[in-house]
Curated annotation (Swiss-Prot):
UniProt pathway annotation: Amino-acid degradation; L-histidine degradation into L-glutamate; N-formimidoyl-L-glutamate from L-histidine: step 3/3
Family: Belongs to the metallo-dependent hydrolases superfamily. HutI family.
HAMAP family documented for this protein: HutI (MF_00372)
Gene: hutI
Organism annotation: Halalkalibacterium halodurans (strain ATCC BAA-125 / DSM 18197 / FERM 7344 / JCM 9153 / C-125)
Record protein name field: Imidazolonepropionase
Length: 426
C-alpha cells in the first residue's frame, strides 16, 4: 500500500526505536531493538511509519531525507539538571587543583553559596536568557527532553523566581522541560542552626507551587551534613500528600539510607547513589524506583569511587544516567560525554547506555508516554547521528556526533560542516 508522509527518512543504517511499555530493568537493558537498512516516516509531527527500506520502497513524501547509512535514535533525555542559576564558578577549579578544601572555599563565600548569591541577584529575565544558552548546547548534543531543578535560591522569593524562569524557558525553547522543586537543596546560612524551620518554610510553598503548576516533582538532598533521613521523610511525605512525584539526591557520599527511603516512599527516582547500600538497592528494585546515576559529577570532582551500576543492573534496577548539569560539580551540557564515562567507569554496555539516555531517562521524569522512544503515534523527536552504528557514539568520546535533531517532526538543529568541500593539496 502506498503511503505519503510529510518527511521520510530513508537509507538509515541502524534505527533504534527503543519502544517499551515501561522502563527497562536489569537484564532487559541489554535487549536492544535494532532495525537495519531502515526508514522512518513522519506525518503531522508524529512518527507514522517505522520499518525497512524494502517496506518503504513505494512510499512518497513532501521531503525525502537520505540518511546515507547513518544511525537514527530517539531524542535523548537528560533527567537531572540544575538548569536555572546565576553566575559561574570557574575560579574554583584552580583552587581545588591546589588542594584547597571545599569547606574553605565555602567559608570564603564560594561553593554553592556563591551560586545562591548570584541567583538571588539575577533578574528573572537574566536567568531565562542564560538558561536558553545552556539549552541550545544541550539540543546540539541530541537532547530533546530534560528535567530542571530549582534549589539555588534557598529562600521563598528566589525559588519562585527559578520555577517561573524554568516554565518560561520551556514555553520558548524546543526542548521539553519537566520542573522539580528542590528548595531543600542545602541549609542556608540564615537557618544553619535550625534546618527544621527552613524545611517548614519550603514545605509552606508546596500548595501554591501545585496550584500554579510550577513543578511536577519535589526533591531533597539527603546526605551527611545536609538533611537527615527523618527530615527528608517528613518533608517528602508532605509533598506526596500534595500530589507531587518524589525524587531524592541520595547517598552521594555516605550510605545514609537515602536509597532505602526512596524505595519506602515509592520515589520515581533516587539520584547519585555513589554510597548506596545493598539493602538500599534492593528496596529501590522492589519499589520500582529508577536509579539516576551521575558519573560526570564523580569524574569532575576527581573522585575514584563511582556508583555501582553493575550491581544495580544485576539486581534488577532500571538505571538512567544524566549530566547533573550545574555550575559547581558538573558544568557540562554534553550527555554524549556522560555516555562515554558510563562505559568507561560504570562499566555499562552500549545497549544499557542507550536505554539509560532514552526510555529509562523518560520514565525517571514521568515522560515515558511522550519521550525517549520512536513508535507510531508518538512525537517525532529524532536524532540523526554522524555514526554508522550505536557503538560508535560512546566509543569516540569528547566529540559531538549529532548530524541533526528533529523535534515534533521539524529540524531544530543541524550541525554546520565547516570542512565540507575543503580540498587539501599536497
Amino acid at each position: 500500500m502506498v503511503q505519503h508522509f510529510d518527511t521520510l527518512l530513508v537509507n538509515i543504517g541502524q534505527l533504534l526505536p527503543m519502544e517499551s511499555k515501561g522502563p527497562k530493568r536489569g537484564k532487559e537493558m541489554s535487549e536492544l531493538q535494532l532495525l537495519e537498512h531502515a526508514a522512518l516516516g513522519i506525518r503531522d509531527g508524529k512518527v507514522a511509519f517505522i520499518g525497512t527500506m524494502v517496506e518503504a520502497d513505494t512510499f512518497t513524501a513532501n521531503q525525502m531525507i537520505d540518511c546515507q547509512g547513518k544511525l537514527v535514535t530517539p531524542g535523548l533525555v537528560d533527567p537531572h539538571t540544575h538548569l536555572i542559576f546565576g553566575g559561574s564558578r570557574e575560579h574554583e577549579m584552580a583552587l581545588k587543583q591546589q588542594g584547597v578544601p571545599y569547606l574553605e572555599i565555602l567559608k570564603n563565600g564560594g561553593g554553592i553559596l556563591a551560586t545562591v548569591e548570584a541567583t538571588r541577584a539575577a533578574s528573572e529575565e537574566e536567568l531565562i536568557t542564560k538558561a536558553i544558552c545552556h539549552l541550545n548546547r544541550m539540543l546540539s548534543y541530541g537532547v530533546t527532553t530534560i528535567e530542571a531543578k530549582s534549589g539555588y535560591g534557598l529562600d521563598r522569593e528566589t525559588e519562585w523566581k527559578q520555577l517561573r524562569a524554568a516554565k518560561a524557558v520551556g514555553e520558548q525553547h524546543p526542548i521539553d522541560i519537566v520542573s522539580t522543586f528542590l528548595g531543600a537543596h542545602a541549609i542556608p546560612t540564615s537557618h544553619r542552626n535550625d534546618p527544621d524551620r527552613f524545611l517548614d518554610e519550603m514545605a509552606d510553598m508546596l500548595g501554591e507551587i501545585k496550584e500554579q503548576n510550577l513543578a511536577e516533582f519535589v526533591d531533597i538532598f539527603t546526605e551527611t551534613g545536609v538533611f537527615t533521613v527523618e527530615q527528608s521523610r517528613t518533608f517528602l511525605q508532605k509533598a506526596k500528600e500534595r500530589g507531587f512525584g518524589l525524587k531524592l539526591h541520595a547517598d552521594e557520599i555516605d550510605p545514609l539510607g537515602g536509597a532505602e527511603l526512596a524505595g519506602e516512599l515509592g520515589a520515581i527516582s533516587a539520584d547519585h547513589l555513589v554510597g548506596a547500600s545493598d539493602q538500599g538497592i534492593q528496596k529501590m528494585a522492589a519499589a520500582g524506583t529508577i536509579a539516576c546515576l551521575l558519573p560526570g559529577t564523580t569524574f569532575y570532582l576527581g573522585k575514584d569511587t563511582y556508583a555501582r551500576a553493575r550491581d544495580m543492573i544485576d539486581q534488577g534496577l532500571a538505571v538512567t544516567i544524566s549530566t547533573d548539569f550545574n555550575p559547581g560539580s558538573s558544568p557540562t551540557e554534553n550527555l554524549q560525554l556522560i555516555m562515554s564515562i558510563a562505559a568507561l567507569r560504570l562499566k555499562m554496555t552500549p545497549e544499557e547506555i542507550w536505554h539509560a539516555v532514552t526510555v529509562n531517562g523518560a520514565h525517571a521524569i514521568g515522560r515515558g508516554d511522550t519521550a525517549g522512544q520512536l513508535a507510531v503515534g508518538r512525537a517525532a523527536d529524532v536524532v540523526v547521528w554522524d555514526a554508522k552504528n550505536y557503538y560508535y557514539v560512546p566509543y569516540h568520546y569528547g566529540v559531538n556526533h549529532v548530524h541533526s535533531v528533529w523535534k515534533k517532526g521539524e529540524v531544530v538543529y543541524e550541525r554546520r560542516r565547516a570542512f565540507e568541500g575543503l580540498s587539501i593539496s599536497r
